[in-house]
């Protein structure tokens, strides 16, 4: 089979067919401002890391409800939508381990890691893609390498909100094992997980208790 392209036309063995249009690149979002250095007694600095590439989907709905609940409880909340930031995968060069945590890669990750350092609580929000967290969140986690020693010394809390369109009972087994290991490795306290399976669309999940549960998760943090 011989393939060739000319403009928006794809030729297969000399026969011209219309080529599928390339989807537009995602619009990069600005990162949120840093957390306040001083915060009211009993209130928390909460960083929400949301991995969905769909701004009007199930994952975004639950993330938004969580943020609303946390803010209404008086907490200081920052949110990063990792699919819309410049996040590259770790190269495994270990330059950072020999150079005081500085990474060779120039992207948004150092600024995001700084927000994580400032936060008391880190909430990961993700769709399930092939029984794993979204690739943008995974890439960010890999880049923890440059701060892992510092993170291990910080008594943080972490939580998880995950959504899966499939209905298998074991849909969350792999990511639960991952987050068990992550919590254990970093020494961060696991404060809870909200996992919804069998809801592929926003309309589906709006009919359930999960949006309310996400709100309560944020509101009841302490």
Where are these regions (language model features)?
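N-terminal beta1-alpha1-beta2 submodule of the flavodoxin-like/Rossmannoid cofactor-binding fold
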Residues: 6-125, 131-147, 208-222
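Short beta-strand elements in bilobed, periplasmic/extracellular small-molecule ligand-binding domains
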Residues: 76-80, 188-196
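Short glycine-rich anion-binding loops that position phosphate/pyrophosphate groups of nucleotides
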Residues: 128-130, 165-166
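Short, glycine-/small-residue-rich phosphate/pyrophosphate-handling segment
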Residues: 135-136, 149-192
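A short acidic, helix-capping loop that chelates divalent metal ions and anchors anionic groups
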Residues: 163, 198-203
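Short beta-strands and strand-loop turn motifs
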Residues: 49-50, 125, 160-164, 194-195
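Short, solvent-exposed loop/turn segments at secondary-structure boundaries
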Residues: 170-173, 203-208
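A short beta-to-alpha transition loop/helix N-cap that caps and shapes the active-site region
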Residues: 86-89, 167-169, 201-202
